[in-house]
């Protein structure tokens, strides 16, 4: 059995915060505001996986009202989400994600993002695709006010597991 999930996240860009995308610290004058490290890419991926599992969203599993998640690395959250998928008998088939940001240019960091995501998901990097685009200066991303991300995942039921 295969299951598909879609995730979306957005965070505001602010001064005095690190810009972390796909678990990579990106040099930039602004960073993303959030309770955790505010990694919009990994948050969208977590939501996509949770959606495919029918398990709600990242806010349900890691609420921003819980001090345990204050400043937490989103790589840790992705590990936890994948652990849940595995307990339900699912493995990642493939993942396709898009980061929407006017700046900074993200192409030099995509390879490291893919490697981080593959490691967190326990899969080969060939199953992970990450791309970045701009909005041609339109909307909040185009004005440099924030960054958003979309992710789509395909989960495959492991051959030896039963539907739970």
Swiss-Prot record:
GO molecular function, one term: metal ion binding
Source organism, top-level taxon: Bacteria
InterPro entries: MECDP_synthase (IPR003526), MECDP_synthase_CS (IPR020555), MECDP_synthase_sf (IPR036571)
Gene Ontology terms: biological process: isopentenyl diphosphate biosynthetic process, methylerythritol 4-phosphate pathway; terpenoid biosynthetic process
Swiss-Prot/TrEMBL catalytic activity: 4-CDP-2-C-methyl-D-erythritol 2-phosphate = 2-C-methyl-D-erythritol 2,4-cyclic diphosphate + CMP
Enzyme Commission code: 4.6.1.12
UniProt keywords, alphabetically: Isoprene biosynthesis, Lyase, Metal-binding
Positions that bind 4-CDP-2-C-methyl-D-erythritol 2-phosphate: 9-11, 35-36, 57-59, 62-66, 133-136, 140, 143
Pathway the protein takes part in: Isoprenoid biosynthesis; isopentenyl diphosphate biosynthesis via DXP pathway; isopentenyl diphosphate from 1-deoxy-D-xylulose 5-phosphate: step 4/6
Binding site for a divalent metal cation: 9, 11, 43
PROSITE patterns in UniProt: ISPF
Self-association state and partner proteins as the record states: Homotrimer.
Protein purpose: Involved in the biosynthesis of isopentenyl diphosphate (IPP) and dimethylallyl diphosphate (DMAPP), two major building blocks of isoprenoid compounds. Catalyzes the conversion of 4-diphosphocytidyl-2-C-methyl-D-erythritol 2-phosphate (CDP-ME2P) to 2-C-methyl-D-erythritol 2,4-cyclodiphosphate (ME-CPP) with a corresponding release of cytidine 5-monophosphate (CMP).
Family in the record: Belongs to the IspF family.
Protein known as: 2-C-methyl-D-erythritol 2,4-cyclodiphosphate synthase
Species this chain originates from: Syntrophotalea carbinolica (strain DSM 2380 / NBRC 103641 / GraBd1)
Gene encoding the protein: ispF
